[in-house]
Each structure stands twice: as C-alpha cells, then as structure tokens.
Amino acid sequence: MENMNVFQLNIGLNNNPYTFEKITEALVVTFEGEIVGTREHMGEYEGRPEPTLVAKIVTEMDSESLRVFTTMMAMKFTQECIGMKVNEEGTLVYNPDFKGEQYTFDAEYFIEF
C-alpha cells in the first residue's frame, strides 16, 4: 500500500442532477481506489446553506490525475467548482464552463471527512 493518497472531496448537492447515492456510485466506478466513506453534511456556498457530499477515498492515483477526474466531475455534476484535498494539499477545481470569479482554497470552508 505504498504510494497511496488520501483524497477528499466536497461536492455540492444543490443544482446537482445526481443524488447522493448516484454520486457515491460514480465515485466507486471512477476511482481506482477504495472509497473509505461518503457522508452528507450541511455546508455553505456563497453564504447560503448547501447540502454537501463529503467523500474520502484512498487511491494510488496521482494528484494530477485526481485533478483531471475532479474537473470531469464538476462538469458531470453541474458544479461551479469542487473542493478537493490530496493528503494535506487543498484546491478548488473549477468547471471549465464557469465564467464567474474564482476563489482560492480556504481550509476553513473545507469539510473534512
């Protein structure tokens, strides 16, 4: 189990055409690792409450591959952005179609698993 990365995601459920269960299924299929768990948490986006899927995945995939997959998920799940952490490094991955102001990752707003 060398070279394993702990990958965490925050995926908003408002404006998302997929349910919590369907997103969890998509994560199982997408990632070449084991989903340690998913849970729903009431988060916040732009000052408004938003139910959020919080996922923790253990995977051999590298950071760049995880970023590419997260970009694809932002598009599939109609998200402006998805917060992600690989080990202790966090970032916001924006949907390429999003034209608004892009923020930088702030650990204070990231929901840990």
Per-range role (PLM):
Residues 30-72, 76:
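Short, intrinsically disordered low-complexity segments
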Residues 21, 25, 64-67, 89, ...:
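Polar/charged alpha-helical tracts
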Residues 1-36, 44-46, 113:
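N-terminal, charge-rich interaction modules
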